């Protein structure tokens, strides 16, 4: 099994898992009228489950027009999903803090601006050129903002896990809910790690689609994230 094939399998698994989990969460939000479920559902269904795989497939489409159209749609979906993620952090973990919503809004602006930069790079790249190389700077900025959001969610998940663990010892919390905060924190840390590796590769001038280290990091990170998603939102019945 070649590294490229392993990467494709892992990322496909992550995308499918994200789409299924995200769709279920959005459906649940329609029934419960819950904003958090809707926001995180959009994150997974729109960005991870649809936008990201579309951006991977786009360069292989037949014809420049089809490729550009797919890349534009993919970037819009990714920006929307990642912005929803930022506001999920604000609304769920810091609902009463005066700074959380402005920080989420700032993150969304960075996502939108860098997303536009990626689109502009693809539109201006000459035919036959590696447009991804032209979008290197904008992609790095986008990933920096994403890693910041993922660091935020990882720290909040682990902070709430510690709080719930103390309450669990007093019989005031549920063990399953407590464990899910731990899984959420671990999932965030995994995402920070694999995106951090990609950022380092981008800044070093490496081809992140072909270099073994970022490809392996993305593959294993995607696989681990898929497992955490299932255990957090669709745990098996033992």
Segments (PLM) and residue ranges:
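Alpha-helical transmembrane segments of multi-pass integral membrane proteins
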Residues: 24-52, 100-109, 139-201
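Membrane-interfacial segments
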Residues: 29-33, 62, 93-97, 126, ...
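General structural signal for secondary-structure boundaries
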Residues: 121-125, 170-175, 234-238
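Interfacial non-cytosolic loop connecting adjacent transmembrane helices
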Residues: 123-133
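C-terminal transmembrane-bundle signature of multipass membrane proteins
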Residues: 153-157, 180-238
């Amino acid at each position: 099994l070649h590294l490229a094939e392993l990467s494709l399998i892992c990322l496909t698994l992550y995308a499918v898992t994200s789409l299924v989990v995200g769709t279920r969460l959005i459906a649940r939000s329609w029934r419960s009228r819950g904003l958090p479920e809707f926001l995180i559902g959009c994150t997974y269904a729109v960005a991870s489950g649809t936008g990201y795989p579309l951006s991977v497939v786009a360069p292989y489409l037949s014809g420049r027009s089809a490729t550009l159209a797919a890349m534009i749609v993919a970037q819009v979906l990714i920006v929307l999903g990642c912005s929803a993620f930022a506001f999920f952090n604000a609304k769920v973990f810091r609902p009463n803090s005066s700074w959380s919503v402005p920080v989420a809004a700032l993150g969304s602006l960075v996502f939108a601006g860098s997303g536009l930069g990626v689109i502009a790079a693809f539109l201006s790249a000459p035919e036959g050129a590696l447009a991804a190389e032209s979008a290197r700077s904008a992609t790095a900025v986008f990933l920096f903002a994403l890693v910041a959001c993922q660091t935020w969610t990882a720290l909040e998940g682990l902070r709430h896990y510690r709080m719930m663990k103390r309450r669990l010892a007093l019989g005031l919390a549920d063990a399953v809910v407590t464990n899910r905060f731990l899984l959420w924190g671990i999932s965030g840390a995994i995402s920070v790690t694999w995106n951090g590796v990609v950022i380092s590769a981008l800044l070093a001038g490496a081809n992140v689609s072909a270099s073994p280290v970022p490809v392996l990091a993305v593959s294993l990170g995607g696989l681990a994230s898929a497992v955490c998603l299932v255990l957090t939102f669709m745990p098996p019945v033992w």
